[in-house]
Amino acid sequence: MRNIHFDAVYHMPWLEYRHATPEGKVVLRLQTGRGDFSRVIAKVTSNYNYPDYFANAMQVEMKVAYRDEFHDWYECVFTPEDVRVKYLFVLESDEQIFKLDAAGLHFGADYYEDISEAFAFAYAYAAPAMPEWAKGCVGYQIFPDRFRREGENEPGLEPWTSDRVQNEFRYGGNLRGIIKAVPYLKELGVQMVYSTPMFLSDSSHRYNTFDYFRIDPLLGTEEDLRELCDELHKNGMKLIMDGVFNHSGVEFAPFKDAKEKGKDSKYYNWFFFDNTEECGYQTFGHWPYMPKLNLQNPDCAEYFLRVGRYWIEKCHIDGWRLDVSPEVWPDFWRQYRKMIKTANPEGIMIAECWDDSREWLTTGDMFDATMHYVLSRNIWNRFCHHRISLAQFDSCLNRSLMLYPERINQVLWTFLGSHDTARLRTRAGGDLRMLHAASFFQFTFPGAPIIYYGDELGMQGGDDPYCRFPMEWHNVEGNVTHAHYRKLAHVRAGSSALRVGSFRTWQVEENGLYAYLRQSDDQQVLCLINTALEPVSGIIRLPEEMAGAAVLTDLYADVPYPVQDGMLKVTLAVGEGVILTLPE
């Protein structure tokens, strides 16, 4: 008889465990101890199916979708006969049967199935659909001052190839430079561009905004931004702007007025003048040059709603990445979402959140996705710092996938470097092989992989400000890392399994060989990657759909891999990965 971990059995009618899809199907998930049960069934009925209720209930088999060291997460997807759903779970282990409902876990097949104690999905409203373009798209982050300079040099600029960097330095990157780089981005395989702030400021990062309705003249004009949007759209790309609405700069006119006039200013309550900090007002990160905004104030909230709407309507941007999202009044984000979806139904709203983001994502009334720092840290810890085993890495991945519905997992921004973090190659100790391995995984995992400008060239740099050196345009031609990223982006664009398919751990080897399955409605691919610092070999048991083939094709290198008796022998060099599929 198995030793069942009863305290691991868990289900709550919250969105990560129970939700509807945009197509109106229902997804149920159940947590159990790893390997504790041989079969799990969801019994589903209608809240109005009286008097029989569960006597003629739909019985839906559940399968293990995700697994970590200690847990299995079962999942089923079905179309309900009635959108007013009641359900419970039947769990089998050897000859023992248990039932789980809202009252708890019960022993025995004969336990009375009480409709009043069943879990309730009061009304299975279809979830809001994500913009199709955002699902699995390849993004590219630009820091405007450091990306590309076009036109006459402004006086006082730091030389582009300078070997020193500080946030107060200006290098003169501008919007005309980004426009000039559109063909480069298209050739690389970019489908969406995200730019850090562009508004008037006295810093190179522009997170201390002075005027939210004015493009910084060092970058260009509103007309330049409109032209950039038009050029990106003509070439099949989107533009996401950075909105800094948690705080402003000290030269923001309402803040200046409030600081000068005190309580006599109509803007006084746009900020927090409460002397909790030495400067006399609340700030972001205890930096006095970034006073915190009070978006609970209706006038302040309305101002920033107008800001968001203005740039969508005037320049046709495709959405906003919102800075320091968790520190902003949540009701403002609900208003902001309504504004975005009204101004541009295909627009997207991305949170900057460094932790578990369920509070901001699973309710469906705030953000579409977040910057997936939880995943980033797991990838860094395995591929760059080698702090965790492959088994631990796999467990972290499965737990992170369990946090959100699939429609959210498809659009989460997966990134390995940004303006706030050390560059990927630097994290990897300068080792291009591990940069290649980490980015291979990034591009073959669910979500929207984001390239930080210059990472595709193997640029180096530590934490802010050293991750913000100007783009090395002289290093593009013949760059093997650039070719690697370009290949990954184009393979991903042509593969529905990689863009929107499910993820399933397939094989985890102690030597660092990792196999995982990606599957969409019309394609299955098996990804193999060497996560170790030395070559690895192994024998991979192939999935049923591939086991009968004589040969499999690697989409990355376009080479054949022979199959023998449903098995595949493979040796991978450091940093190497393959994307296997049936030959056409």
Spans of features found by a protein language model:
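Carbohydrate-binding surface patches
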Residues: L15-Y17, V26-R29, W506-E545
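The feature marks proteins involved in alpha-glucan
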Residues: M1-K25, R29, N49-G139, R149-V165, ...
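Substrate-binding/active-site clefts of carbohydrate-active enzymes
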Residues: C137-G139, F143-Q191, M198-K314, Y336-N344, ...
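Beta-strand-rich binding/interaction modules
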Residues: F37-N49, Y53, Y87, P535-A557
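C-terminal beta-strand-rich structural cap/linker in extracellular carbohydrate-active enzymes
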Residues: R34, Q564-E584
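Aromatic/acidic polysaccharide-binding cleft in carbohydrate-active enzymes
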Residues: D145, T363-G364, D368, Q410-L432, ...
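Active-site-proximal helices and loops of the catalytic beta/alpha 8
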Residues: C229-M237, F252-K259, E313, D323-R407, ...
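Conserved, mostly hydrophobic/aromatic
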Residues: L30, I142, L185, S195, ...
